[in-house]
Amino acid sequence: MHAKINPKKVEMFNLLKEFLDGKDSVFFLDYRGLTVATLTELRNRVENEKGELKVVKNNIMKRVLKDKHMEGLDSYLLGPTAVVTAVDEANVIAKIFYEFVKTSSLKVKGGFVLGEVYDEAKLNAYSKLPTKKESISLFMNVLKAPISKLARTLKALSDVKDVKV
């Protein structure tokens, strides 16, 4: 005898599978105690950074993760769970979570970033990394510093020569 599968659950499975398609980072949050307004604000901030947030049923999400070969994440699927995905600059989205953690009851459970399982502590450290723009800016400043010093030295030499003449 075959157990009849609920079509709503199959549909939810397919939607969650699609939700994870093409995403290289997935985060798990405990939203217990958040007001609707706070959760909506979190969702909007995540979407502004090209991420997506969905409240999920843990058992269905476990099956989706297994189907996607994303192992080692079951421990993050306990209690109320919101799943956030990111395509680019996942640490920017992680920064958003930790801003909310400071002022609300939001808890970061863990995540899956570029094929690796991150616990809460590792995600917290990851959220403190500079963004792509900040990294490029830092790199440009490092490159620019010796050139600026050379330009100032040449200018000083030029000024000295002008004084002697």
Curated annotation (Swiss-Prot):
Single Gene Ontology BP term? translation
The keyword Methyltransferase belongs to this UniProt entry's keyword annotation = no
One Pfam annotation reads Ribosomal_L10
Signal peptide boundaries = none
Q: Identify the SUPFAM superfamilies for this entry.
A: Ribosomal protein L10-like (SSF160369)
Keyword match rRNA-binding: yes
Check the record and name the HAMAP family matching this protein. Answer: Ribosomal_uL10 (MF_00362)
The protein in question is named: Large ribosomal subunit protein uL10
Taxon lineage: Bacteria, Pseudomonadati, Spirochaetota, Spirochaetia, Spirochaetales
Q: Which gene encodes it?
A: rplJ
